[in-house]
Structure formats: structure tokens, C-alpha cells
Amino acid sequence: MATTFSASVSTLATSLATPTRISFQKPALVSRTNLSFNLRRSIPTRLSVSCAAKPETIEKVSKIVKKQLSLKDDQKVVAETKFADLGADSLDTVEIVMGLEEEFDIEMAEEKAQKIATVEEAAELIEELVLLKK
């Protein structure tokens, strides 16, 4: 779905008033006497994902997930890893949550625990609960 933004720019030069219609689809430079508008829009070329959780929390959660799912040591588990992609079913997810609660000495509300699908989501929720506990 593409959206085109447009704007009208009016400049008065001596006795002429000329409205100019500019489409923002492509970069443009409009100049009139001493007046210029650079209409170049910066468009991100790459989307990057960043974790709000601390790396050490992500690492602890990853280790617990590996332990609960009996994964091999060389199995890669990172922040974006989904429990379902590791073969976890709903019972496995409950066991993961129980392991996390024990390790971090917290209690997760059932509604929030059911929404956890990735290591990152678990780590972020844990950090939130640890802060609330203090």
C-alpha cells in the first residue's frame, strides 16, 4: 500500500503568484529567487530490531529455555527465537514460565504468561516484574 503526500507551495515573485504542486514520491528541490525548499524525505533503508531487555537477562532466559526443552548446547537460542520454532507446545511453555519464575523469584500473571512467544518477550516481562518487585 503506497501513500502519496503532496503539498502546495506558493511563491510571490513581482506580479506573479504561481502555486506549485509537488509530489513527495521522489526527492525534489524547488527554488524561486532566494527561496528554496529541500523536499527530500529520508526513508530508512533497513529495519533494525532492538531489544529492550538487558543482554544478561536474555542469556539467562535462553539457558532456561534450553534446559526446559532439553535442547543441545550447540542449539542457537537468541532474543527473537520463538518457543514454537523450538518445538515447544503449551505444556512446555508453562514449564518454561515456571522455570523463569523460580530463577528470577517472580510471579507472572497467567494472562501475561500466555502471551509470551519469544525469548525477548519473556526477558522484557521478567525485567518489568523485577522492577515492580523492588
Swiss-Prot record:
Residues 1-51 form a transit peptide. It is found in: Plastid, Chloroplast. GO terms for molecular function: acyl carrier activity; phosphopantetheine binding. 4'-phosphopantetheine is transferred from CoA to a specific serine of apo-ACP by acpS. This modification is essential for activity because fatty acids are bound in thioester linkage to the sulfhydryl of the prosthetic group. Keywords: Chloroplast, Fatty acid biosynthesis, Fatty acid metabolism, Lipid biosynthesis, Lipid metabolism, Phosphopantetheine, Phosphoprotein, Plastid, Transit peptide. It holds the Pfam family PP-binding. Pathway: Lipid metabolism; fatty acid biosynthesis. Residues 55-130 form the Carrier domain. GO terms for cellular component: chloroplast. SUPFAM superfamilies: ACP-like. NCBIfam families: acyl_carrier, PRK00982.1-2. Carrier of the growing fatty acid chain in fatty acid biosynthesis. In rape seeds ACP is coded by two multigene families. There are probably a total of 35 genes. This is Acyl carrier protein, chloroplastic. It comes from Brassica napus. The lineage of its organism: Eukaryota, Viridiplantae, Streptophyta, Embryophyta, Tracheophyta.
